[in-house]
Amino acid sequence: MEIDLPFKVEYSKSSRASCKGCKNKIEAGILRIAAMVQSAFHDGKQPNWFHEQCFFQKQRPTSAGDIENFENIRFEDQERIKKAIDNCTTVISAGGSKKGAKRSKGENNAIKDFGIEYAKSGRASCRGCEQKILKDQIRIRKTVFDTEVGMKYGGQPLWHHVECFAQLRGELGWLDTGENLPGFQTLKSDDKADVKKALPVIKDEGVSSAKKAKIEKIDEEDAASIKELTEKIKKQSKRLFKFRDEIKNEMSKDDMVALLEANNMEPVKGDSEKLLDQVADLLTFGALLPCTDCKGRQLLFHKSGYLCNGDLTEWTKCTKLLKEPERKSCKIPGYLKYKFLKDVRKNPEVRAIRYIPPSTSTILKNISLKKGDELDGPKVKRERPPLYNIEIALIAPKEREGIVKDRISKLGGTVSTKITEKTTVVLSTPEEVERMSSRMKKAKTLGLHVIPEDYLEAVEQNGAGAINYISSMSLCDWGTDPATRITQEESKSSKSKSIYTKSVPKSMTLKIKDGLAVDPDSGLEDVAHVYVSRNKEKYNVVLGITDIQKNKNSFYKLQLLESDMKNRFWVFRSWGRIGTTIGGNKLDNFSNLVDAIVQFKELYLEKSGNHFENRENFVKVAGRMYPIDIDYAEDSKIDLSAEHDIKSKLPLSVQDIIKLMFDVDSMKRTMMEFDLDMEKMPLGKLSQKQIQSAYKVLTEIYELIQGGGTNAKFIDATNRFYTLIPHNFGTQSPPLLDTTEQVEQLRQMLDSLIEIECAYSLLQTEDSKADINPIDKHYEQLKTKLEPLDKNSEEYILLQKYVKNTHAETHKLYDLEVVDIFKVARQGEARRYKPFKKLHNRRLLWHGSRLTNFAGILSHGLKIAPPEAPVTGYMFGKGIYFADMVSKSANYCCTSHHNSTGLMLLSEVALGDMMECTAAKYVTKLPNDKHSCFGRGRTMPNPSESIIREDGVEIPLGKPITNDSLKSSLLYNEFIIYDIAQVNIQYMLRMNFKYK
């Protein structure tokens, strides 16, 4: 996969661009350098162009390898840029503090990137400890140029506490004394002394030795061969650019194209400079033969060789890179009479290459883009001040305000005179509490404690008691837990978010008309609807494409809108990157339908490569987008937790369980856990066909893993999967899918998605009965009888014992508390199970699943994975898995500290004769004399303590025993059946997972 380089160089194609430094025009034909920044308007990078001399004032490249197209500029220009990069030192050495010592030009430039001052506010955070820098505290600046903001705006100031800067100064590049920091002279005398003490001179021996090692390394290499290679590149560059200049001045574009095609080479389209490079390379070194992998005829010189620009498949670019590609002599068509063509040599020549790798920071940035930010905590550990993140509102005498504010600030707190939702506590007097002003009344309404000024003295003496003192020293008889009112610090991961993801709305409200949603960005949702033809053709399209090679995760929405009242039409389209604010939209107005349809179809063809009329037989075209099959139905507006005019006839515990199973927020949280895009793929909108296609792609990836597939095939399948199931990666690059763990995780996601789709479709079902409570309606839709058990009944106590006894020793993260037990009778299931009721070896066994899956499970029963699903994750093949240890199944409920409610099933399972296994064995068909598979684990419930019910069903509720002599790779028993009729769900338990 390509490395995303931060800079680009070329000879300007025209004089339209302006320099981002001096703001003057960049004349055509001169060298210009760009910082490549994320475009705010489309899913890709855009160049911010600079004059060569202006570029180095605003940017700090550390390697010529970071500059795209560097290898295609003149040799003398390359050398000059490399020299300028060498002058871009980012380390301020101790030399400047010596008398008479002069700094280098690079150091003088870099010293401007540092500064010291008093914090103007308390908003900025320290980049070392990640805590806020309080107002009037000393802070030190390092301006960086390699961040998203720094690249875009020519530098981003990052602030540090003095102590944190001191610990990171080697990394930040300041080895000099603190008194040489710009701004030092503005500090107070005491503060100057503190800074000098914290930042003494560091001798830069380490830097010198690094330089020395570099020189020694070069000496060890064959200096003669380096010189020879450099001379060869210089000569070749001179000859190549002689041709290039003559081609540019004399040859027409048509003749360039004809010359390339005569040599069986595909001309570059849409980039005049690259076309010039391609023709000059042909005349200098000979004609390139087609790529052996994809048969592509466009190989372009790129960094360390010739990169094929062809397509391996309609989903994947070719990744072939050749250092010495095969060539043949350049053919000159007889009708081309340019004089300089006589200088073309008969025999092809090998192009000399000097590869300059990208800088370490660029490589690391690309790795983090692929993997996502690692949450490794702050770089510097620093104790927080006692009132950190505590906002104190003052209702105090004016004469005390200044003194109190200073004390609070020194303790790390923030002060306000307004009382808001963000206020933690109010500092006031007993008299003010007695007086009960409007502000004090508001404090009471918000449940804010009122504390005296003595509180500050107590905190100054013992900072650890800051929270407890609020309650113990309170002057009022009201107040909620103050700990819940402290502002939660933003996590590192959210701080490192892109500027294009921080303001993305979590969801959007769609107004549905005739089953189709008008995009609210059009501004026409109240006056127009999506046009549907007489043939029921819906002029509403969502296209998408994910390309991990180019870090693209794009969408394109296209709608033909018709006015609700007048004979008026619009074509609306919006585009961008999924999960970000990157993108734009456009609305075109039409007075007649024919013109609107023509434009709609032209745009569809342009973006997808397919005619709108043929969309049912869509064929993916390389580099073009693919339709996402989304069915926009009316969003559910039913709030099951709200009061309803008609009372429910169900027991309260059953009502609660229905609310849980049909909780839309819970469904949305589950989808967001899987990084699914909630705007392009809202709840209940992705078609079954699309999900089945995604299953097939996962199966294909699994087979590639098993068979050792090529990287290109993994890229191809990854692009297809993420296009079918839109994911929100923000500005991060979509990860390559090439491990069984990823396949298993995504299979579980699709399993959950199917069940969520099922539950949501039940929520959408229209019901003619208006005289029924919504909870009762959804209960009826499940076609399942749920009867709560009496908590004092023998049955309840027996099942509670089953839970208590079979919690495995290795599952210590949580305890299980039984909240409710329901007797379950699914409609038609007893009849289906009847033939197996006579089978021997029937047991009551556990099955756990996500809470959001249960509406689907109860409405259609437990299911076996579809044929198109990958086999990964199924130790014993595709079947329904059960356990006799409660915690073994409980782990599949996917609960957490924050979502601690889970549902579990106890089912009567007809096991009959079991095929016993002690290690993974993928079962596609059981032997004729077996009814189920038994994965025997080393630990199991004591069989002698099992209870046999009157109907012959075994309840294995004995305490665990371990068979140390058994050689098994399984810790606990697993029971698998391959026929859904062998299951009869009998109980559902609502569990509280009490995490430790």
From Swiss-Prot:
MF-aspect GO terms: DNA binding; NAD binding; NAD+ poly-ADP-ribosyltransferase activity; NAD+-protein-aspartate ADP-ribosyltransferase activity; NAD+-protein-glutamate ADP-ribosyltransferase activity; nucleotidyltransferase activity; zinc ion binding
Bilayer-spanning residue ranges: none
Residues of the PARP catalytic domain: 773-996
Catalysed conversion reaction: NAD(+) + (ADP-D-ribosyl)n-acceptor = nicotinamide + (ADP-D-ribosyl)n+1-acceptor + H(+); L-aspartyl-[protein] + NAD(+) = 4-O-(ADP-D-ribosyl)-L-aspartyl-[protein] + nicotinamide; L-glutamyl-[protein] + NAD(+) = 5-O-(ADP-D-ribosyl)-L-glutamyl-[protein] + nicotinamide
WGR domain mapped to chain residues: 527-625
Location of the protein in the cell: Nucleus
Primary localisation category: nucleus
GO CC field: nucleolus
SUPFAM superfamilies: ADP-ribosylation (SSF56399), BRCT domain (SSF52113), Domain of poly(ADP-ribose) polymerase (SSF47587), Glucocorticoid receptor-like (DNA-binding domain) (SSF57716), WGR domain-like (SSF142921)
Region (Automodification domain): 370-507
UniProt keyword annotation of Repeat present: yes
InterPro entries documented for this protein: ARTD/PARP (IPR050800), BRCT_dom (IPR001357), BRCT_dom_sf (IPR036420), PADR1_C_dom_sf (IPR038650), PARP (IPR008288), PARP1-like_PADR1_N (IPR049296), PARP1-like_PADR1_Zn_ribbon (IPR012982), Poly(ADP-ribose)pol_cat_dom (IPR012317)
Enzyme type, top EC level: transferase
UniProt DNA-binding region: 1-369
Key words of the record: ADP-ribosylation, DNA-binding, Glycosyltransferase, Metal-binding, NAD, Nucleotidyltransferase, Nucleus, Repeat, Transferase, Zinc, Zinc-finger
Protein residues bound to Zn(2+) 3: C291, C294, C308, C318
SMART domains reported in the protein's UniProt record: BRCT, PADR1, WGR, zf-PARP
EC number: 2.4.2.30, 2.4.2.-
Residues that hold Zn(2+) 2 according to the record: C126, C129, H161, C164
Region (Zinc ribbon): 286-329
Residues in PARP alpha-helical domain copies: 647-764
Biological process terms in GO annotation: double-strand break repair; protein poly-ADP-ribosylation
ZnF PARP-type span: 7-89, 114-203
Family classification: Belongs to the ARTD/PARP family.
Miscellaneous comment text of the record: The ADP-D-ribosyl group of NAD(+) is transferred to an acceptor carboxyl group on a histone or the enzyme itself, and further ADP-ribosyl groups are transferred to the 2'-position of the terminal adenosine moiety, building up a polymer with an average chain length of 20-30 units.
Protein name as annotated: Poly [ADP-ribose] polymerase
